[in-house]
Design a protein with these regions (language model features):
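A short, charge-rich alpha-helical start-of-domain segment used by transcription regulators
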Residues: 1-11, 21-24, 170-178, 182
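"A position-specific structural signal for the A-helix of alpha-solenoid helical repeats
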Residues: 225, 229-232, 280, 284, ...
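Amphipathic helix-loop-helix modules that constitute alpha-helical solenoid scaffolds
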Residues: 66, 74-131, 138-306
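Residue-level preference for hydrophobic side chains embedded in well-ordered alpha helices
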Residues: 1, 5, 9, 30, ...
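Short, charged helix-capping/linker segments at alpha-helix termini
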Residues: 10-27, 37-46, 140-141, 191-195
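Σ70-family region 2.3-2.4 aromatic/basic alpha-helix that recognizes the −10 promoter
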Residues: 31-35, 45-74, 151
Length: 397
């Protein structure tokens, strides 16, 4: 329950104290108070409202101690000191507004990407430092220091606790969406370690995307991201075999794809715009719509990737487009596209480039060259499951 409520409590308290680090401490203090009192007094009818009221009382006490009572009380305009907890819950719109402000604050561009991810999972996702460290194969002390430094950076930069509007809004929203997207991707296809998939990270990112879509119903790209994650999450259970080995898309048991998540993805897609996340969601939707691998509309997918390249030029997107072209028009049509990408500095250490090239060469009947590409790809990946699969493909040739 606290994981669900913690983000809202931290958001509500941050509006008072204007410091996410202090707000988190107060929220945790409210939880400790609940653990001490509830066994004797019983769980209140609205535990979330009780926690919120208790935390806000603590926040106001802190403000009163730090600043002149009259000036600070007038500034924050609070009257909660007259209301003993448990109190009536705050208006849902007020809570949602505070939560949205917190999302934009912890994803502020003043923070490095790794710091934004860690702070978002901690304050919005409600994960413990230990859980975040385990998910990203980092030490607990490293993650703890990253979170502490991020809080200090926000305080030092005096990042306003507000939802941006005007010209700054688009860039700030992109920063928020990027954090959620990166968290999901790390769970969907782990960059390192012994596991290909980390479902818990995908679940956390999907939950954040759903929350954001509910908070910003007018933003098409938010729904585009939500749709993308719903579609992708529908396949997670089939991406690995019984022993954790990777299962290629062509070999996945589509009867095990989660139809509820696919339906949710389709609903979110109906509210998406035409931005990069919406286009990626449309591509994922094409895969989800195919009952069999052979039914996949690769021509449509190649077209969508072409549009995505125009919106967000990227060699990785170009590589994905080349794969779709190879399926729609044959490997001979795609090989020149992949060869052209070999000159891209950004892909020089990207294991999927030689992996895709190896697949094309194998399909073209050039096994010796294909084997060399698979071996090179295996040397570049940091994921043990991917490395094993690539070496197995090389050994077959």
């Amino acid at each position: 329950m606290f994981r669900i409520e913690s983000a809202r409590i931290i958001a509500g308290v941050t509006r008072i104290v204007r410091d996410v680090g202090i707000a988190e401490e107060i929220a945790q203090d409210a939880l400790v108070t609940a653990l001490e009192q509830w066994p004797q007094s019983g769980v209140p009818d609205r535990p979330g409202a009780w926690l919120m009221a208790t935390a806000k009382h603590r926040a106001i006490d802190l403000v009163r101690r730090k600043e002149t009572y009259a000036r600070k009380l007038a500034e924050v305009g609070r009257t909660l000191e007259d209301e003993p907890p448990p109190a009536e819950p705050a208006e849902p719109d007020d809570i949602d507004d505070d939560l949205l402000r917190l999302v934009f604050t912890v994803c502020h561009p003043v923070l490095a990407t790794e710091a934004r991810i860690a702070l978002t999972l901690r304050l919005i996702g409600g994960l413990t430092t230990q859980e975040i460290a385990r998910a990203f194969l980092a030490s607990e002390s490293t993650i703890a220091q990253r979170i502490v430094r991020a809080k200090r950076t926000l305080a030092k930069a005096a990042v306003p606790f507000e939802v941006p509007y005007g010209a700054d809004r688009g860039a700030r929203l992109s920063s928020v969406l990027e954090v959620i997207y990166l968290v999901f991707n790390e769970g969907y296809s782990a960059t390192s370690g012994d596991d290909l998939v980390r479902p818990a990270l995908c679940e956390d990112a999907l939950r954040l995307a759903r929350v954001l879509a509910a908070l910003m119903p007018e933003e098409g790209e938010v729904h585009g991201l939500a749709a993308l994650l719903e579609f992708q999450a529908s396949r997670i259970a089939t991406r690995t075999g019984p022993d954790g080995e990777p299962v290629l898309l062509a070999d996945q048991n589509r009867a095990r794809w989660n139809r509820l998540l696919i339906a949710r993805g389709a609903r979110a897609m109906s509210r998406a715009g035409s931005g990069p996340y919406a286009l990626q969601a449309a591509i994922a939707g094409c895969h989800a719509a195919a009952v069999r691998y052979e039914d996949t509309d690769w021509a449509a997918i190649a077209t969508l990737y072409g549009r995505l390249v125009q919106l967000t030029p990227s060699p990785v997107v170009e590589l994905n487009r080349a794969v779709a072209v190879s399926m729609a028009e044959g490997p001979a049509a795609a090989l020149p596209l992949v060869d052209a990408l070999a000159r891209e500095p950004a892909l020089s250490a990207y294991y999927l480039l030689p992996s895709v090239r190896g697949d094309l060469l194998e399909r073209l009947g050039r096994p010796r060259e294909a084997r060399g590409e698979f071996e090179r790809a295996a040397s570049l990946t940091r994921n043990e499951r991917e490395r094993t699969l690539l070496l197995r493909r090389a050994a077959r040739l």
